[in-house]
Amino acid sequence: NCLDPKDGEPCGKCAACLTDVSESIDIIEMDAASNSKVDEMRALLEKAEFAPIYLKTKVYIIDEAHMLSKSANNALLKTLEEPPAHVVFILATTEPQALPATILSRCQRFDFRRLSVHNLAANTRRVLRSAGAEIEDEALMCIARAADGGMRDCLSIADQCLSFCGDADSTEQKLI
């Protein structure tokens, strides 16, 4: 959605690049694990017909896409066959083999590798600091190892640790 891309890469400076994804009405996330029924999918697809308000492209992120019901997949398939020009669908899943072949054949696939313990720790530290929280380095490394390469898991474990231990007491000994 960058308004001024350089060599195919986002500029990082325009209004679209600086948009807070969590507050954009043109970027919609659906958790398919809790919204797996056909009626929920149809409601989302009806909204896809409308042009984006602020961005060039409306983005629909369907998380845990492998959890969609058969009828929800069929509804999605019709739209994937002839998607509106102003819409991009991102199907995120940890189980691509569980998606129907008819859906997969209409998707461009990107596989993401697990992050290193160092990258997990650094990214989690950045997120925690932006939220005003701190965890000792040893505890953070313990959390990163437990996350097994998954950023979402690392943030979830860190959140649980902060809830259990409290900000100042998040030490490796308490976590173990």
Predicted feature locations:
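P-loop/Walker A NTP-binding region and its immediately flanking N-terminal helices
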Residues: 1-109
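Extended, largely alpha-helical regulatory/partner-binding modules appended to the mid-to-C-terminal parts
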Residues: 15, 19-25, 56, 92, ...
